[in-house]
């Protein structure tokens, strides 16, 4: 039977003496009455045995202890049989069973290896051997950790922590031979220390940044093909594009590199929009997905679309030189058919309202793209007619662009009855410097309001599947066109 240190149980040989009548006047039995047993034993009322009982007067037992005039002599006589709790006489040694290192304070016995704080050399040798065999993938699975914990007599937490520290050490020494990942496959739950999370997240961040910069630095071709993938794939947590399609800097880079290199265009998107960030956002939405500079970018991988014509970006930017003829514009997109457009024209009113507020239709068919360019072109300083807007679909079965500005279209989709001279302005190219005139004032105001709606809409609409985004807005726009 073991007792914690400092709580002294008298040996059985001595207890026989203390079982005398309680109020005898003898010195031996005096301090051992029931009310004094704990007081002189050194546990609760006095830190050391006899320190209070024999030196301080107390009404309970003072009359039974007849001391001489010298209390020190009496105390010495008393200690001759009581002894200190740390002074184990031969008689006491046999009956005191507590462990000298306070084993009762822990749930493990003293010699248990699970109680050990430090890993032994054998344990670390085993772990190092496993690590050397798995340098390509130093992430033990849960089963391997349990096996190693049994072999090394360590806990599962200790094994996980050891591997986290080992990976960090190797990384600091530039001996990393594996590709870092966020967590190991078996999801080390709370057992793992935070060091491992920080350890593996940091190398991930530069790689993510590199991935995000890849499409921008690659010029307009990659931008054209990556436009729909960005929105259809899972949203990357680090990317700024997910907030409002593409960030300002993103769009400026792509417009400066891709468009200005191959087809010289005077201004950038951010600089050419006088109405500020709202119209810049409109420019971003339509711009990156219709790069006019690419004569024939490959079809979009995700939607199977044909390359958009050069109308969308040229409407938003200041007047361009005459564009190359749009290639292969007669092929029909695969996501919807003309039959669907013809049969489901009852949604036109809903589609018209939602089409302008929808955030960045990523990969619309050519028709939807031109419509978007038309409806969003108004905030730009140049009037929205450009040579590329003249007839994006020569000989196509769907309506060509100039018809969108006639009276039946705009009263239904915006709140304007007329657009001033825009109706009668079918010329191939307006003057480059024509700023927004008086007929643009109401238009600017309303489009800016719609831009505010745009800024809020992406957050709501992104919760839906990204494929719907790629489908719906151009789909409804084209349905609207079939009604005219």
From Swiss-Prot:
Location of the region described as Disordered in the Swiss-Prot/TrEMBL record: 176-393, 424-443
Pfam families tied to this protein: Homeobox_KN
Biased composition regions of type Pro residues, renumbered to the chain: 318-328
Changes seen on gene knockout: Disruption causes increased KCND2 potassium-channel expression in endocardial myocardium leading to abolition of the cardiac repolarization gradient, a selective increase of the major cardiac repolarization current, I(to,f), and increased susceptibility to arrhythmias.
Compartments, as annotated in UniProt: Nucleus
Keyword terms: DNA-binding, Homeobox, Nucleus, Phosphoprotein, Sensory transduction, Transcription, Vision
Domain of life: Eukaryota
GO biological process, one term: cell development
Cellular component terms (Gene Ontology): nucleus
Cross-referenced SUPFAM superfamilies: Homeodomain-like (SSF46689)
DNA-binding region: 112-174
GO MF annotation: an example: DNA-binding transcription factor binding
Compositional bias per record (Basic and acidic residues), positions renumbered to this chain: 203-212, 249-265
UniProt feature, compositional bias: Low complexity: 375-389
Bias-annotated ranges (Acidic residues): 185-202
PTM annotation (Phosphoserine): residues: 273, 465
Tissue expression from the record: Not expressed in the developing metanephric kidney or adult kidney.
CDD domains assigned: homeodomain
Annotated function: Establishes the cardiac repolarization gradient by its repressive actions on the KCND2 potassium-channel gene. Required for retinal cone bipolar cell differentiation. May regulate contrast adaptation in the retina and control specific aspects of visual function in circuits of the mammalian retina. Involved in craniofacial and gonadal development. Modulates the migration of progenitor cell populations in branchial arches and gonads by repressing CXCL12.
Stated family: Belongs to the TALE/IRO homeobox family.
UniProt protein name: Iroquois-class homeodomain protein IRX-5
Organism: Mus musculus (Mouse)
Name of the gene: Irx5
């Amino acid at each position: 039977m073991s007792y914690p240190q400092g709580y002294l149980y008298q040996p059985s040989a001595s207890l026989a003496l203390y079982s005398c009548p309680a109020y005898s006047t003898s010195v031996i039995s005096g301090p051992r009455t029931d009310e004094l047993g704990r007081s002189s034993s050194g546990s609760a009322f006095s830190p050391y045995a006899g320190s209070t009982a024999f030196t301080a007067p107390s009404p309970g037992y003072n009359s039974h202890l007849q001391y001489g005039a010298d209390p020190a002599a009496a105390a010495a006589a008393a200690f001759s049989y009581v002894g200190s709790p740390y002074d184990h006489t031969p008689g006491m040694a046999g009956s005191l069973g507590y462990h000298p290192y306070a084993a009762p304070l822990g749930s493990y016995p003293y010699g248990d290896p699970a109680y050990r704080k430090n890993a032994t050399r054998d344990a670390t040798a085993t772990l190092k051997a496993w690590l050397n065999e798995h340098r390509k993938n130093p992430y033990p699975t849960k089963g391997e950790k349990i096996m190693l914990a049994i072999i090394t007599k360590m806990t599962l937490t200790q094994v996980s922590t050891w591997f986290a520290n080992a990976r960090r050490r190797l990384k600091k020494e530039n001996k990393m031979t594996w590709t870092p990942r966020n967590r190991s496959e078996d999801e080390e739950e709370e057992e793992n220390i935070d060091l491992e999370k920080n350890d593996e997240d940091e190398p991930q961040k530069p790689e993510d940044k590199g991935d995000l910069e890849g499409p921008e630095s690659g010029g307009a071709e990659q931008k054209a093909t990556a436009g729909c993938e960005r929105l259809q794939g899972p949203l990357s947590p680090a990317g700024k594009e997910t907030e409002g399609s593409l960030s300002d800097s993103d769009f400026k880079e792509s417009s400066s590199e891709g468009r200005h290199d191959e087809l010289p265009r005077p201004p950038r998107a951010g600089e050419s929009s006088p109405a500020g960030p709202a119209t810049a956002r409109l420019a971003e939405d339509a711009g990156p997905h219709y790069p006019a500079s690419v004569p024939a970018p490959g079809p979009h991988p995700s939607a199977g679309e044909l390359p958009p014509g050069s109308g969308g970006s040229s409407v938003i930017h200041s007047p361009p030189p005459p564009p190359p003829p749009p290639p292969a514009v007669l092929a029909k997109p695969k996501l919807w058919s003309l039959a669907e457009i013809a049969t489901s024209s009852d949604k036109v009113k809903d589609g018209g309202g939602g089409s302008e507020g929808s955030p960045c239709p990523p990969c619309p068919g050519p028709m939807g793209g031109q419509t978007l360019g038309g409806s969003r072109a108004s905030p730009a300083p140049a009037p929205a007619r450009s040579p590329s807007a003249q007839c994006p679909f020569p000989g196509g079965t769907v309506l060509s662009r100039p018809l969108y500005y006639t009276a039946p279209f705009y009263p239904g989709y915006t709140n304007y009855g007329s657009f001033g001279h825009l109706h009668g302005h079918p010329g191939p190219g307006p003057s480059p410097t024509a700023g927004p005139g008086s007929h643009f004032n109401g238009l600017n105001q309303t489009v800016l309001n719609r831009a505010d709606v745009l800024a809020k809409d992406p957050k709501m609409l992104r919760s839906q599947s990204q494929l719907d985004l790629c489908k719906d807005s151009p789909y409804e726009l084209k349905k609207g066109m079939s009604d005219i």
